[in-house]
Protein backbone atom coordinates (compact mmCIF):
# COMPACT_ATOMS: atom_id res chain seq x y z
CA UNK A 1 0.00 0.00 0.00
CA UNK A 2 3.04 2.22 -0.38
CA UNK A 3 4.25 3.45 -3.73
CA UNK A 4 7.40 5.50 -4.33
CA UNK A 5 7.79 7.44 -7.56
CA UNK A 6 10.94 9.32 -8.50
CA UNK A 7 11.18 11.91 -11.27
CA UNK A 8 13.65 14.43 -12.59
CA UNK A 9 12.80 18.07 -13.29
CA UNK A 10 14.72 20.37 -15.59
CA UNK A 11 15.63 18.01 -18.40
CA UNK A 12 16.28 19.68 -21.76
CA UNK A 13 13.05 20.45 -23.67
CA UNK A 14 10.91 20.01 -20.53
CA UNK A 15 7.72 22.07 -20.51
CA UNK A 16 5.11 22.84 -17.86
CA UNK A 17 2.93 20.29 -19.64
CA UNK A 18 5.60 17.66 -18.94
CA UNK A 19 5.69 18.66 -15.27
CA UNK A 20 1.91 18.38 -15.03
CA UNK A 21 2.18 15.00 -16.73
CA UNK A 22 3.89 13.78 -13.55
CA UNK A 23 0.80 14.69 -11.52
CA UNK A 24 -1.39 12.99 -14.12
CA UNK A 25 0.68 9.81 -13.85
CA UNK A 26 0.47 9.86 -10.04
CA UNK A 27 -3.32 10.05 -10.21
CA UNK A 28 -3.36 7.16 -12.70
CA UNK A 29 -1.39 5.10 -10.16
CA UNK A 30 -3.92 5.98 -7.46
CA UNK A 31 -6.82 5.08 -9.76
CA UNK A 32 -5.20 1.75 -10.69
CA UNK A 33 -4.76 0.95 -7.00
CA UNK A 34 -8.41 1.80 -6.27
CA UNK A 35 -9.55 -0.44 -9.10
CA UNK A 36 -7.32 -3.38 -8.14
CA UNK A 37 -6.57 -3.26 -4.41
CA UNK A 38 -7.71 -6.26 -2.40
CA UNK A 39 -7.73 -4.47 0.97
CA UNK A 40 -8.76 -0.86 0.37
CA UNK A 41 -9.24 -0.18 4.09
CA UNK A 42 -5.48 0.08 4.57
CA UNK A 43 -5.33 3.00 2.17
CA UNK A 44 -2.58 4.03 -0.20
CA UNK A 45 0.44 6.27 0.39
CA UNK A 46 2.17 7.62 -2.69
CA UNK A 47 5.54 9.22 -2.07
CA UNK A 48 6.65 11.39 -5.00
CA UNK A 49 10.18 12.78 -5.13
CA UNK A 50 11.77 15.00 -7.75
CA UNK A 51 15.43 15.61 -8.41
CA UNK A 52 17.00 18.61 -10.13
CA UNK A 53 18.63 17.69 -13.45
CA UNK A 54 22.43 17.88 -13.32
CA UNK A 55 24.20 17.71 -16.70
CA UNK A 56 27.01 15.15 -16.38
CA UNK A 57 30.17 14.43 -18.36
CA UNK A 58 30.12 11.56 -20.84
CA UNK A 59 26.38 11.81 -21.45
CA UNK A 60 24.38 13.15 -24.39
CA UNK A 61 23.33 16.11 -22.23
CA UNK A 62 26.84 17.11 -21.12
CA UNK A 63 26.55 20.30 -23.21
CA UNK A 64 23.23 21.38 -21.71
CA UNK A 65 22.69 24.07 -19.14
CA UNK A 66 21.03 23.44 -15.82
CA UNK A 67 17.86 25.44 -15.24
CA UNK A 68 18.20 28.09 -12.53
CA UNK A 69 17.35 27.19 -8.93
CA UNK A 70 14.43 29.64 -9.12
CA UNK A 71 13.03 27.88 -12.19
CA UNK A 72 13.46 24.48 -10.54
CA UNK A 73 11.55 25.68 -7.46
CA UNK A 74 8.82 27.15 -9.68
CA UNK A 75 8.37 23.76 -11.33
CA UNK A 76 8.31 22.04 -7.93
CA UNK A 77 5.60 24.45 -6.79
CA UNK A 78 3.61 23.90 -9.99
CA UNK A 79 3.71 20.16 -9.40
CA UNK A 80 2.87 20.42 -5.70
CA UNK A 81 -0.18 22.59 -6.49
CA UNK A 82 -1.60 19.68 -8.48
CA UNK A 83 -1.24 17.16 -5.65
CA UNK A 84 -4.52 17.70 -3.83
CA UNK A 85 -4.96 14.12 -2.58
CA UNK A 86 -4.08 13.48 1.07
CA UNK A 87 -2.51 10.17 0.06
CA UNK A 88 0.32 11.96 -1.79
CA UNK A 89 3.56 13.05 -0.11
CA UNK A 90 5.90 15.21 -2.18
CA UNK A 91 9.59 15.94 -1.60
CA UNK A 92 12.20 17.54 -3.80
CA UNK A 93 15.98 17.75 -3.77
CA UNK A 94 17.77 20.82 -2.51
CA UNK A 95 18.54 23.14 -5.43
CA UNK A 96 21.71 24.37 -3.71
CA UNK A 97 23.11 20.87 -3.34
CA UNK A 98 22.20 19.99 -6.94
CA UNK A 99 23.86 23.16 -8.24
CA UNK A 100 27.01 22.31 -6.30
CA UNK A 101 26.87 18.81 -7.79
CA UNK A 102 26.68 20.34 -11.29
CA UNK A 103 29.64 22.61 -10.57
CA UNK A 104 31.85 19.70 -9.56
CA UNK A 105 30.53 17.34 -12.23
CA UNK A 106 31.44 19.85 -14.96
CA UNK A 107 34.25 21.68 -13.20
CA UNK A 108 37.87 22.23 -14.02
CA UNK A 109 41.11 23.00 -12.17
CA UNK A 110 39.82 26.42 -11.07
CA UNK A 111 37.74 24.61 -8.46
CA UNK A 112 40.75 23.35 -6.47
CA UNK A 113 41.12 26.60 -4.50
CA UNK A 114 37.32 26.70 -3.97
CA UNK A 115 37.37 23.24 -2.38
CA UNK A 116 40.31 24.21 -0.19
CA UNK A 117 38.59 27.43 0.95
CA UNK A 118 35.32 25.60 1.70
CA UNK A 119 37.08 22.90 3.74
CA UNK A 120 39.04 25.53 5.67
CA UNK A 121 35.73 27.21 6.52
CA UNK A 122 34.35 23.94 7.88
CA UNK A 123 32.51 22.35 4.96
CA UNK A 124 32.28 18.59 5.68
CA UNK A 125 30.10 15.68 4.53
CA UNK A 126 28.30 18.02 2.17
CA UNK A 127 26.61 15.21 0.25
CA UNK A 128 24.34 14.79 3.28
CA UNK A 129 21.49 17.30 3.55
CA UNK A 130 21.73 17.51 7.33
CA UNK A 131 25.38 18.65 7.14
CA UNK A 132 25.20 20.78 4.00
CA UNK A 133 25.81 24.49 4.49
CA UNK A 134 25.65 26.31 1.17
CA UNK A 135 26.86 29.59 2.66
CA UNK A 136 30.32 28.06 3.21
CA UNK A 137 30.50 27.14 -0.45
CA UNK A 138 29.06 30.47 -1.55
CA UNK A 139 31.74 32.29 0.45
CA UNK A 140 34.45 30.02 -0.99
CA UNK A 141 33.34 30.74 -4.56
CA UNK A 142 33.36 34.48 -3.87
CA UNK A 143 36.77 34.36 -2.13
CA UNK A 144 38.25 32.56 -5.15
CA UNK A 145 36.48 34.76 -7.71
CA UNK A 146 34.76 31.76 -9.33
CA UNK A 147 31.20 32.06 -10.61
CA UNK A 148 29.09 28.91 -10.17
CA UNK A 149 26.87 29.78 -13.13
CA UNK A 150 29.86 29.29 -15.45
CA UNK A 151 29.43 25.57 -14.74
CA UNK A 152 25.67 25.33 -14.17
CA UNK A 153 23.35 27.61 -16.14
CA UNK A 154 25.71 28.04 -19.07
CA UNK A 155 25.35 25.62 -21.95
CA UNK A 156 28.57 24.42 -23.56
CA UNK A 157 29.19 24.69 -27.29
CA UNK A 158 29.53 21.44 -29.23
CA UNK A 159 33.01 22.47 -30.37
CA UNK A 160 34.05 23.73 -26.93
CA UNK A 161 36.91 21.86 -25.27
CA UNK A 162 35.45 20.34 -22.12
CA UNK A 163 37.45 19.72 -18.93
CA UNK A 164 36.95 15.95 -19.25
CA UNK A 165 37.89 15.71 -22.94
CA UNK A 166 41.36 14.42 -22.00
CA UNK A 167 39.81 11.28 -20.46
CA UNK A 168 39.28 8.40 -22.89
CA UNK A 169 36.30 6.28 -21.87
CA UNK A 170 36.17 4.38 -25.15
CA UNK A 171 33.18 6.34 -26.45
CA UNK A 172 33.77 9.48 -28.48
CA UNK A 173 31.98 12.82 -28.67
CA UNK A 174 30.39 11.85 -31.98
CA UNK A 175 28.37 9.15 -30.23
CA UNK A 176 27.13 11.55 -27.54
CA UNK A 177 26.29 14.21 -30.14
CA UNK A 178 24.33 11.65 -32.17
CA UNK A 179 22.48 10.51 -29.03
CA UNK A 180 21.79 14.13 -28.07
CA UNK A 181 20.25 14.74 -31.50
CA UNK A 182 18.13 11.59 -31.15
CA UNK A 183 16.96 12.73 -27.71
CA UNK A 184 15.86 16.09 -29.09
CA UNK A 185 14.02 14.25 -31.87
CA UNK A 186 12.34 11.98 -29.31
CA UNK A 187 13.95 8.85 -30.76
CA UNK A 188 14.91 5.80 -28.73
CA UNK A 189 18.24 4.10 -29.36
CA UNK A 190 17.79 0.33 -29.52
CA UNK A 191 20.09 -1.86 -27.42
Regions from the PLM with identified roles:
Residues 3-12, 59-65, 158-162, 185:
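Glycine- and acidic
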Residues 12-19, 65-72, 127, 162-169:
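Hydrophobic alpha-helical scaffolding
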Residues 1-59, 71-95:
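Conserved C-terminal portion of the radical SAM core fold
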Residues 63-75, 82, 186, 190-191:
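Short secondary-structure subsegments characteristic of cysteine-rich extracellular domains
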Residues 84-191:
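Radical SAM enzyme core and accessory elements
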Amino acid sequence: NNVKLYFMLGLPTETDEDVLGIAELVYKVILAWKENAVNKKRGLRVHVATAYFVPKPFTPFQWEQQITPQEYLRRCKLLKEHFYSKSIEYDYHSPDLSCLEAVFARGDRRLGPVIEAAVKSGARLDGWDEYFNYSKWYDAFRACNVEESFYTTRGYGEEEILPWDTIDIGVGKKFFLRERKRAYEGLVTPD
